[in-house]
Amino acid sequence: MIEIKDVMKSFENKNVLNHLNVTISSGSIFGLIGPNGAGKSTLLYLLNGISKCDEGSILFDGKDVYENPDVKKDILFISDDPYYFHFATIDEMKDFYLTFYPQFNLETYQHYVYLFRLPQNKPLKDYSKGMKRQAMFALALAIAPKYLLLDEAFDGLDPVMRLAFKKAINQMIDENMTVIISSHNLRELEDICDSFGILENGCMTTSGDLYDIKDHIHKIQLAFKEELNKEEFSHLDVLSFHKQSRVINMVVKGDINEIKDYLRMFNPIMLEVLPVNLEEIFIYEMERKGYGVYD
């Protein structure tokens, strides 16, 4: 289990993370999403023990990660720009990791090198961006760390490689690996993650199991005999509100039965609850925060 407790982090007097609290269950895949500059990469560096929290703590199975080799040996972090020795081949990087990770599985390594069609004698510096990421995935899956942290996991991967990677991650979860993935590709995250957190201005505005989140965020289309204004619905927790004449499309947080009971007081001639996906949830949350590009 990972516990992020009241974490604060600032750079040059600017708060990047502000009293952040999140718990991530063991053996799960947690999707970390948010706009640019929200603090996602900063949080991943703190989780990896590279940086220290200004306040609060980050615990892995009850142990603080910062300057704790016993914890950090169970964590592998793949950044948005993975590091390799400049002239190294993937086989040379494999030999390097073998010295630090005794559990490194050569059979697994060869399987993914073959699956990803990675040239083993070609310097990694000559790989494409997508191939470099695939190479790091092959090494990571062979190491099989207890905790895997991924920044922009799907960036540079073609659809076939994305599918192969998602299948590999699901197999590792069956062995109780815990994965945190930061990505702008929300549709990919929705396919693979158990739970999510939306990070905005250093705070987690929404977090939890995807199905629980969907149970409390609803897209509703209504039609009325007469025009109504947004103020009529002030008793609801409205994330998004769009009106076109007598037709209203809104996104509302809360218990759906209570919401429908309240809306029926206005005698709609149509009331329909529509399915909502993760990308829409993110957009509606950002719209409420004033990101007008989503209008």
Explain the meaning of each model-derived region:
Residues 56-71:
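Conserved ABC transporter NBD signature motif
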Residues 30-35:
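The feature captures the beta-strand-to-loop junction immediately N-terminal to the Walker
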Residues 251-295:
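C-terminal coupling/interaction segments
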Residues 165-254:
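ABC transporter nucleotide-binding domain
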Residues 48:
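Helix-to-loop junction immediately C-terminal to a conserved catalytic motif
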Residues 148-152, 157:
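Catalytic Walker B motif of ABC-type/P-loop ATPase nucleotide-binding domains
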Residues 79-135:
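ABC-family P-loop ATPase nucleotide-binding domains
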